[in-house]
Structures are given as structure tokens and as C-alpha cells.
């Protein structure tokens, strides 16, 4: 994992387009209309956009990691607690057997612990993604109905993890986990 740079734009465009193709083939809503915005995140001056870079495949994941979450979905007490907030995770479906989304999430859990931040939080729009996030150790805190979306608010305590094998080999899929 490393911070995204402008030099990553073409690889991120490739990975987002591949994910859009994958989603569309399955009849799922795609991010194709947001492709340019997702690629533009590589130029984010706030230094909160990270990529998972593979020696073999190039950039295989992108994720936003911020120290402040959205103003909705979390209680005032939760918002007052230090946490890393994950959003905008996109992975290359060509390497899904290595579970790059899980690799990125576990990296964030370890990073939070190294920074002394007790929580990693995230939200998602689909129950299938919430189930996948649970395989990464996240728990469902609550659901929140927004105007046009039902959100699954999820959290996991930070902890130090030995990520050597995870980065080298990916993480094995659990039975029934095809993501």
C-alpha cells in the first residue's frame, strides 16, 4: 500500500473500468459515470488516497482513508472517537482470488493501530458488500436510511497485524466467498 500519485492515473482508470465491466456483466449498478472522478482522486492533495500496488499486476486496488467520517451514520460519541474511515474501495476483479479488498482493509486495521487510532470504520450500500466486510472482521453497527440509499455502518477495532504473508500471497477466500 502506498499513497496514490498522478502517475497512477492510467492504472487506476484500467482497474475502475475492469470493475465496472465486472459489475455490469452481473447486472449491478456500475461506477462508470464516476470513472473520471475516481481516477482524479490520484491527484488528491490531502494525501488520503491509497493504492494497492502489485509487482506482478500493477495497481490492483484504490481506497480513501480519512481521519474524519461523514456527518451522518455515526453518533456524536462515535464521531468524537479517533478513527480511520475507509471509503471508495475499488479492486481489480482479475485478482479477486487474492482478495485485494481484504488486503487493503487489513492494512488499514494495522495502520490505525500503528497510529494509535482505536477504530476503523466504513460504510457500504449493499448487503453483499456488508457480508464481505464481515469476513474482514468488521461488525455491523447499524443501518441508516438516507434519501436514496440504505447504508450499512461498520466498524472494527484497530490491531497490529503481521501482514507479510497477506501482502505476498493475498488472503484465501473463505468457503462461499467469491468476491
Where are the predicted features?
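A short helix-loop-beta-strand connector motif used in the catalytic cores of GNAT acetyltransferases and
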Residues: 39-51, 61, 68, 85
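C-terminal "cap" of GNAT-fold acetyltransferases
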Residues: 18, 126, 139, 146-179
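Conserved acetyl-CoA-binding loop-helix of GNAT-fold acetyltransferases
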Residues: 91, 97-110, 135
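A short beta-loop-alpha structural element at the N-terminal edge
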Residues: 1-14
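Conserved acyl-donor/pantetheine-binding loop and adjacent beta-alpha core of acyl/acetyltransferases
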Residues: 58-90, 96, 148-149
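Conserved GNAT-fold acetyl-CoA-binding loop/helix
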Residues: 17-40
